[in-house]
Amino acid sequence: MKCAALITEYNPFHNGHVYHAQQARQIADADVTIAIMSGQFVMRGEPAVYNKFIRTQMALSTCDLVVELPAYAALSAGEYFAEFGVKVADYMNADALVFGSESGSIQAFEELALQINHIEEHPEFQIKLREGKSYPRIISELLGEPPLLQTPNNILGLSYVQAILKSAPTIQPFSIQRHKTEHHNQAISDNHFASGTAIRHALNTEDKMWEQVVPNSIHELYAKPHMNTNQLFPYLKYKILSTSSDDLRAIHTISEGFEHRLKSSISTSDNFEQLMNQLKTKRYTYTRIQRMLMNVLLNFKQQDKPTTLNAVRILGMNETGQRYLKQLKQDFPERRFITNVNKTTAPYFKPEIKATEIYNLISGQTQTDFNTPVIRVKNKEK
């Protein structure tokens, strides 16, 4: 069976994601599509609006198999996010990786990726990296701001192609052009497509406009409890106040003395917005700060950051996905494809289990990694 992988967040799932999965199946001539999905926390540095089990059910309306992107990767910048997304795709023996971009031209990505992979070996690149500059900024300084690196999905797409060239050359990358919805636009203006930002805003303001940009088949899932990020601030404040500067410095993604800025800002902040206003500088993007804060909340330490992939958590599958998984287990008996978390398999997923526990503490939800078995559904018309 030919497999196309999609690295996703589905925060939450909407018509744009349906289009992505359908195009991936077509462009890669795939028999099966795998969604490699962030779990309880996402790359923008927030808890996902719906928990990973609800989002898995949403994804199975279109995809055949849903697996979890490791939690450390989900709360990392594009390079590490992409690196582990590609590791999971390779572990699942994907033939293709299909991503959305503003460009849509895979040739442009491949040419620039080769150029950048050579630049990374340059001493000046390493110096700038040690100075704490972001990866896209370093590339722009050394290459004169390539046009391809002017939009967020292009930047992430480039990271995917780089990761494939470095560690998974058997995977063929494809890019499809995204529908033009402004990524940070909070209004739903199109009658078919909208950004995740706009849909989350609609959910939090009880605006039913989301119904026109979400598949009818999953409307009932949207009625399930969802997370409001305002709920997390008291837990975050307690964590920062009760953690020493030395221990904060050891947290994944914390750098350049940012722990001191955290300690000095938290006492005078009464809510998340106030804290962000105090922490924001030209040096740090809003998203980068939020990722730091979520890593603090979860106590994700830099020394525990995974470098290898020892198992993959299977969150859900339809009948096609189940056949593909059976084939994988036969072809790769040494690999661990985990469908249920128990005492034996839990050690492979400690960060993910912790993320679910904290997510539930904040939201009051009760679905855990231990009491939620792999989700199985019947095939649907694609």
UniProtKB/Swiss-Prot annotation:
Catalyzes the formation of N(4)-acetylcytidine (ac(4)C) at the wobble position of elongator tRNA(Met), using acetate and ATP as substrates. First activates an acetate ion to form acetyladenylate (Ac-AMP) and then transfers the acetyl group to tRNA to form ac(4)C34. The gene is tmcAL. Pfam families: HIGH_NTase1. Disulfide bonds: none annotated. Keywords: ATP-binding, Cytoplasm, Ligase, Nucleotide-binding, RNA-binding, tRNA processing, tRNA-binding. The lineage of its organism: Bacteria, Bacillati, Bacillota, Bacilli, Bacillales. GO terms for biological process: tRNA modification. NCBIfam families: cyt_tran_rel, PRK13670.1. Belongs to the TmcAL family. The keyword tRNA processing applies. This is tRNA(Met) cytidine acetate ligase. Gene3D superfamilies: HUPs. GO terms for cellular component: cytoplasm. It comes from the Bacteria. It is found in: Cytoplasm. SUPFAM superfamilies: Nucleotidylyl transferase (SSF52374). Its EC number is 6.3.4.-. InterPro entries: Cyt_trans-like, Rossmann-like_a/b/a_fold, tRNA(Met)_cyd_acetate_ligase. GO terms for molecular function: ATP binding; ligase activity, forming carbon-nitrogen bonds; tRNA binding. The keyword tRNA-binding applies. It catalyses: cytidine(34) in elongator tRNA(Met) + acetate + ATP = N(4)-acetylcytidine(34) in elongator tRNA(Met) + AMP + diphosphate. ATP binds at residues 7-20, 100, 153, 178. Transmembrane segments: none annotated.
